[in-house]
């Protein structure tokens, strides 16, 4: 510590406690004399009042620090609690969506006349269910066979016919395949060579 009360570049708190009253006394005398560069008005500031305010601020600062720390701790806890709550809500919503999906599926089945007739005919009997499904398979196979036959008939009717022979047995074009006009031009407007 040096002569000015500075320890390692800082001001000691005891020295500061001595300097503050001296500074305020100097400020008060400058204010009363009017010789100071800054005139503070007519209100006198007492050192005791300022020291009392400083003590109150010193009491408030630890409270604010504790509040800040508790907010920092609780923020992490609250965020994890919020995350857990959101995950639980998502699980509940997923379950609800599955329930709604199943309810929709059951509703569609109850509106389906084929399903209702299946349920009436089988009444939960495994043998009857097998027989009913086999009869439906036979119906489907019969319908597929009929569709295939009809497609074959339509395909045969729509198939292009083989073109008539335009060449003779020797491969020479037949003479009647072009019609010529007088003057040696064909119907299409081309001249024939003679």
Swiss-Prot record:
Chain intervals for the UniProt region annotation (Disordered): 151-194
InterPro entries in alphabetical order: DASH_Duo1
Function: Component of the DASH complex that connects microtubules with kinetochores and couples microtubule depolymerisation to chromosome movement; it is involved in retrieving kinetochores to the spindle poles before their re-orientation on the spindle in early mitosis and allows microtubule depolymerization to pull chromosomes apart and resist detachment during anaphase.
Main localization category: nucleus
Subunit architecture: Component of the DASH complex consisting of ASK1, DAD1, DAD2, DAD3, DAD4, DAM1, DUO1, HSK3, SPC19 and SPC34, with a stoichiometry of one copy of each subunit per complex. Multiple DASH complexes oligomerize to form a ring that encircles spindle microtubules and organizes the rod-like NDC80 complexes of the outer kinetochore. DASH complex oligomerization strengthens microtubule attachments. On cytoplasmic microtubules, DASH complexes appear to form patches instead of rings. Within the complex, DAM1 and DUO1 may form the microtubule connections.
Keywords: Cell cycle, Cell division, Centromere, Chromosome, Chromosome partition, Coiled coil, Cytoplasm, Cytoskeleton, Kinetochore, Microtubule, Mitosis, Nucleus
Protein name: DASH complex subunit DUO1
Gene Ontology annotations for the cellular component aspect, listed alphabetically: cytoplasm; DASH complex; microtubule; mitotic spindle; spindle pole
Domain of life: Eukaryota
Organism field: Eremothecium gossypii (strain ATCC 10895 / CBS 109.51 / FGSC 9923 / NRRL Y-1056)
């Amino acid at each position: 510590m040096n002569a000015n009360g500075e320890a390692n570049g800082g001001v000691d708190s005891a020295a500061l406690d001595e300097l503050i009253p001296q500074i305020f006394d100097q400020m008060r005398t400058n204010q009363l004399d009017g010789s100071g560069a800054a005139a503070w008005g007519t209100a006198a500031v007492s050192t005791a009042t300022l020291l009392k305010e400083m003590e109150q601020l010193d009491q408030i600062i630890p409270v604010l620090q504790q509040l800040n720390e508790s907010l920092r701790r609780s923020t992490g806890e609250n965020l994890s609690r919020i995350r857990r709550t959101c995950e639980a809500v998502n699980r509940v919503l997923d379950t609800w969506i599955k329930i709604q999906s199943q309810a929709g599926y059951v509703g569609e089945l109850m509106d389906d006349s084929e399903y209702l007739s299946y349920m009436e005919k089988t009444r939960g009997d495994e043998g009857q269910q097998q027989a009913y499904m086999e009869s439906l398979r036979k119906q489907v196979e019969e319908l597929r066979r009929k569709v295939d036959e009809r497609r074959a008939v339509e395909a045969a009717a729509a198939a292009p016919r083989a073109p008539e022979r335009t060449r003779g047995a020797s491969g020479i074009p037949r003479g009647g395949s072009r019609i010529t006009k007088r003057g040696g031009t064909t119907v299409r407007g081309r001249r024939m060579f003679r």
